[in-house]
Amino acid sequence: QAFGAGNFRECTNMLARAIAVALLLGLLILTLQYPLGEAALWAMNGSQMTRDYYYTRIWAVPAGILLFGLNGWYNGMQNAVIPMCTAVTVNIVHMSCSLWFAFRMDMGIVGIAYGSVIAQWTGVALSVVLLRIFYRKKITRIDWREVVDLKPLRAFFAVNRDIILRTLCIVAVYTFFTGASARMDDPAMLAVNTLLLELFTLFSYMNDGFAYAAEALTGRFIGARDERSLRDCLRKCILWGMVVSVVFVGLYVGWWRELVGIFVEPDAPNAAAIVALAGRYIGWIIAIPLAGAMPFIMDGIMVGATHSRIMRNSMFCSTAAYFAIYYGLYGWIGNNALWLAFTLYMFLR
């Protein structure tokens, strides 16, 4: 919104807030790494290898949080290229360093952790360098009194709070989905549901792109008070989201066996049985893109408009409905209750 209004002073303040909060949160996690780590290791009965990995990998956490803040700021500035370049660089460095340390240096899983740390901090360094190259003239001098001013700071934390609560609901739904699948009488049901959920994940990645576009452009046009462009942008984002949904429905109808086969080891003794069992529930995967086209885009619109409370409340209601539908119908229709609950959860969002 500040970008749309041409208020680069507030853009600078937002960047400073994001970096300051990321650094403070990262330092807090590093400070508490021992009690947090020991509690988690005790709860999961972690091995020495897990302990070594954790105490190495934890040093990448501040960099990861910083990258979230920097990438969010770039998206708000209508620049998706720098986050993409950063993500590609992080992945290349991560793979290269992990392979080098784990196999060439014979460091095992700790080597992979070192690869993660180096990759994340490389991403931060690249992001900061690109920030200085491309935004040096637009970034104003930081006035820390404005940065810590309570009114914009409250709004900043309110949006972050609502996004975190939304994310916790999503994690609860997906975690419960996996747990409920594992508790079913048929042990193959966990494999089938996981495979089918991967097909939904492919669709969600595509629609996430329109959600990010809606988020950035909604903020821009609201800040510029350009209602006509805002309406046009929202119509196009929704239209393309629906087009992607229809394309995926066609893809799932015509090639669901081939898509499921990608995730099934062909030589596995029960491969044919898993594919056949997946076919009994493929109708839900065909229905979900139609029910789930709008939630991603509407989340982007609400975040861009800073109406995150609406997004949070809709998530609370749909999550409650998800659990109510599952527990109300599981005794009658079994695994179909889980998929019906998930489909209606997406639709209600």
What is the predicted role of each segment?
Residues 1, 60-64, 154-221, 241-249, ...:
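Transmembrane helix-bundle signature of multi-pass secondary active exporters and lipid flippases
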Residues 1-31, 67-83, 192-253, 292-306, ...:
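Small-residue-rich hydrophobic transmembrane alpha-helices
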Residues 17, 26, 30, 90-92, ...:
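Residue-level recognition of pore/gate-forming positions within transmembrane alpha-helices
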Residues 22-120, 125, 129, 133:
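Hydrophobic transmembrane helix module of multi-pass membrane transport proteins
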Residues 28-51, 55, 247-279:
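Short membrane-interface helical motifs at transmembrane helix boundaries
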Residues 46-70, 195, 199-201, 269-298:
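Alpha-helical transmembrane segments of multi-pass membrane proteins
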Residues 91-125, 258, 319-349:
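Membrane-interface helix-loop junctions in multi-pass transport and translocation proteins
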Residues 116, 127-170:
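Interhelical loop/hinge segments that connect adjacent transmembrane helices in multipass membrane
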